[in-house]
Amino acid sequence: MEIDISKYRNIGIMAHIDAGKTTTTERILFYTGKQNRIGEVHDGAASMDWMEQEKERGITITSAATTCFWNGYRINIIDTPGHVDFTIEVERSLRVLDGAVAVFDGVAGVEPQSETVWRQADKYSVPRVCFINKMDRIGVDFYRCVNMIKSKLGVVPLVIQLPIGSEKDFKGVVDLISMKAIIWEEETLGAKFSYEDIPSDLLDKAQEYRNLLLDTAAGMDDEAMNAYFESNDLPVDLLKRCVRSGAIKGAFVPVLCGSAFKNKGVQPLLDSIVDFLPSPVDVDEVVGTDPKDLEKKIKVKPSEKEKFVALAFKVMTDKFVGSLTFIRIYSGKLKSKSTVLNAGKNETEGIGRMLLMHANNREDINEAKVGDIVALVGLKKAITGDTLCSSDFPILLERMEFPEPVIEIAVEPRTTSDQEKLGIALSRLVAEDPSLRMSVNAENGQTILKGMGELHLEIITDRVKREFNVDVNIGAPQVAYRETITKSVEIDYTHKKQSGGAGQFAKVKILFEPLEAGSGFQFESKIVGGAIPKEYIPGVQNGLELIKEGGMVSGFPVIDFKATLIDGAFHEVDSSPLAFELAAKGAFKEMASKAGPKMLEPIMKVEIITPEEYMGDIMGDVNSRRGQVLSMETHNNSTIILALVPLASMFGYINVLRSMSQGRAQYSMHFSCYEQVPQYVVNELKYN
């Protein structure tokens, strides 16, 4: 079916864990006719949760792509995980999407991971609509949730629906644009619904919220503003145009409600995706750079008449077809069996097959065009973040940034004969998951896996066993500590070696400066007048990149500092990139003792929900874990405690929390920042 690009919607479904993302996606697929039955998460039958671990645990672990059609529009959907350990899946999905549906639990409201995924969407300027889900649950409060969206996310929630009833009495919604009630039929699994008059007890509230809707939306369009001043109302088409304009600009976020599990509210959500979220031609042109001149900017027009440009946002291994590279096409067309240029690597690769994916089901296609999200078979070198393009149009698109791991474990095969198989398995999994890192301990030869949390690493080791048939022994989780500097120092270092024949000579003067938390490592060269030839400067950066991973005092990677190469000297015969790499390493070692090295630890933002009677014990326990309580809020006889706690104090916390609350309290946490480790804790670590 040939569909114009203006009728494409590339969207993601994002939320905190258990808000109902996958259930919402399953209903979308059912009502659009993509599948003829509803897959339930709790039965392990959701089509989008296809991994064995997802079915067993009832959670989404990896982002899954699919395509469906609604009223002549093509909707490409990526269902993303809600658990913080898999936030990388959200990051890379949002990088290539034009819009998103943020799903909220109508009882819990805005939760910690809701805030995290919202910030990720802000980073890529992704327009959103909000769907307040679970309107049938006990304790649901639509209006509280709307207020939380405003206060916690700092956006203007534009309410375009009101719930009719709540909890077990939830029947449908009031559509504030048409000023009609929408009621769903239970016996048809929500496939049939009717438009009715608004219930009399909701008329005043509906009119109040419609006036707010008109006041907010009319300002998006001069024609609408004039019409609103004249008649104090707007025709439906003009009002929809205003809501669409404001949503795409980010002036406000349309808010809808429903219960995906009870089959209510999903069709209007589909209408809102079509009506209020952008097509590829509605968003800003993608801007890339020339691989040969990174200062030169190149704009990419979303047209199939332009040269082919795409971004690889995910790589995964399929046991039937091998390596799959998921791409979003930003311009041009691509045919199967053709070749593409990997601009970052300056290498051309051939494509075998091209697939349209529905979770892990594959459909072969011969051609894809601008706006499409497809999977390519046959690429050997492409990794997440690579730009693929026409050979005669080299361009680099902005890569994604991935968070640093916060936890690590030692992994070894149970039998030495499996050592090679383990290496192959982990290499493939690391290639799939940019938030997973692997290294080998130089002292004892142990393989170290680093990830975003205990669950992340648990899933990875489980996949090693299931998918690669390698049984492994796993060490206890360890915190991924870091080091940093606290003082600025200037180091003048000369590397000189003479042992017959050509020697080695390199002199560098480097200014090392501490940076704000989260800045990582930055390198800058201020060499002028040829003090060091251009071709030797990358050797300095490479030397620093390598040596910082080994730490300064405690052996942990060094972060949040800047190294500026300000001067140096070279020898016509004895200088080389290697000599300058060694000089940089020498300067770093000398700097380590002078720059006030400090050890850093990951701090987690923890949300605990507990019945009020256990609050005192839980607060005391948080304090004993070096925690800092940020806020407390009471809702529906439960207390919500928000705290910052070192990750080192959180291992096995769920068992302690259950014991203190007789199994009634729950918690979630996500990475917040790195902070200095108190000296007494450093001493304990050294002693242990």
Curated annotation (Swiss-Prot):
<feature type="binding site">
    <location>
        <begin position="15"/>
        <end position="22"/>
    </location>
    <ligand>
        <name>GTP</name>
    </ligand>
</feature>
<dbReference type="InterPro" id="IPR000640">
    <property type="entry name" value="EFG_V-like"/>
</dbReference>
<dbReference type="InterPro" id="IPR005517">
    <property type="entry name" value="Transl_elong_EFG/EF2_IV"/>
</dbReference>
<dbReference type="InterPro" id="IPR009000">
    <property type="entry name" value="Transl_B-barrel_sf"/>
</dbReference>
<keyword id="KW-0547">Nucleotide-binding</keyword>
<dbReference type="Pfam" id="PF03764">
    <property type="entry name" value="EFG_IV"/>
</dbReference>
<dbReference type="InterPro" id="IPR047872">
    <property type="entry name" value="EFG_IV"/>
</dbReference>
<dbReference type="GO" id="GO:0097216">
    <property type="term" value="F:guanosine tetraphosphate binding"/>
</dbReference>
<keyword id="KW-0963">Cytoplasm</keyword>
<dbReference type="Pfam" id="PF03144">
    <property type="entry name" value="GTP_EFTU_D2"/>
</dbReference>
<dbReference type="InterPro" id="IPR035647">
    <property type="entry name" value="EFG_III/V"/>
</dbReference>
<dbReference type="InterPro" id="IPR027417">
    <property type="entry name" value="P-loop_NTPase"/>
</dbReference>
<dbReference type="InterPro" id="IPR041095">
    <property type="entry name" value="EFG_II"/>
</dbReference>
<dbReference type="InterPro" id="IPR031157">
    <property type="entry name" value="G_TR_CS"/>
</dbReference>
<keyword id="KW-0342">GTP-binding</keyword>
<dbReference type="GO" id="GO:0005525">
    <property type="term" value="F:GTP binding"/>
</dbReference>
<dbReference type="GO" id="GO:0005737">
    <property type="term" value="C:cytoplasm"/>
</dbReference>
<dbReference type="InterPro" id="IPR020568">
    <property type="entry name" value="Ribosomal_Su5_D2-typ_SF"/>
</dbReference>
<keyword id="KW-0648">Protein biosynthesis</keyword>
<dbReference type="Pfam" id="PF00679">
    <property type="entry name" value="EFG_C"/>
</dbReference>
<dbReference type="Pfam" id="PF14492">
    <property type="entry name" value="EFG_III"/>
</dbReference>
<dbReference type="InterPro" id="IPR005225">
    <property type="entry name" value="Small_GTP-bd"/>
</dbReference>
<dbReference type="InterPro" id="IPR009022">
    <property type="entry name" value="EFG_III"/>
</dbReference>
<comment type="function">
    <text>Catalyzes the GTP-dependent ribosomal translocation step during translation elongation. During this step, the ribosome changes from the pre-translocational (PRE) to the post-translocational (POST) state as the newly formed A-site-bound peptidyl-tRNA and P-site-bound deacylated tRNA move to the P and E sites, respectively. Catalyzes the coordinated movement of the two tRNA molecules, the mRNA and conformational changes in the ribosome.</text>
</comment>
<protein>
    <recommendedName>
        <fullName>Elongation factor G</fullName>
    </recommendedName>
</protein>
<dbReference type="GO" id="GO:0032790">
    <property type="term" value="P:ribosome disassembly"/>
</dbReference>
<dbReference type="InterPro" id="IPR035649">
    <property type="entry name" value="EFG_V"/>
</dbReference>
<dbReference type="InterPro" id="IPR004540">
    <property type="entry name" value="Transl_elong_EFG/EF2"/>
</dbReference>
<keyword id="KW-0251">Elongation factor</keyword>
<dbReference type="InterPro" id="IPR000795">
    <property type="entry name" value="T_Tr_GTP-bd_dom"/>
</dbReference>
<comment type="similarity">
    <text>Belongs to the TRAFAC class translation factor GTPase superfamily. Classic translation factor GTPase family. EF-G/EF-2 subfamily.</text>
</comment>
<feature type="domain" description="tr-type G">
    <location>
        <begin position="6"/>
        <end position="281"/>
    </location>
</feature>
<dbReference type="GO" id="GO:0003924">
    <property type="term" value="F:GTPase activity"/>
</dbReference>
<feature type="binding site">
    <location>
        <begin position="79"/>
        <end position="83"/>
    </location>
    <ligand>
        <name>GTP</name>
    </ligand>
</feature>
<feature type="binding site">
    <location>
        <begin position="133"/>
        <end position="136"/>
    </location>
    <ligand>
        <name>GTP</name>
    </ligand>
</feature>
<dbReference type="InterPro" id="IPR004161">
    <property type="entry name" value="EFTu-like_2"/>
</dbReference>
<dbReference type="GO" id="GO:0003746">
    <property type="term" value="F:translation elongation factor activity"/>
</dbReference>
<dbReference type="Pfam" id="PF00009">
    <property type="entry name" value="GTP_EFTU"/>
</dbReference>
<dbReference type="InterPro" id="IPR014721">
    <property type="entry name" value="Ribsml_uS5_D2-typ_fold_subgr"/>
</dbReference>
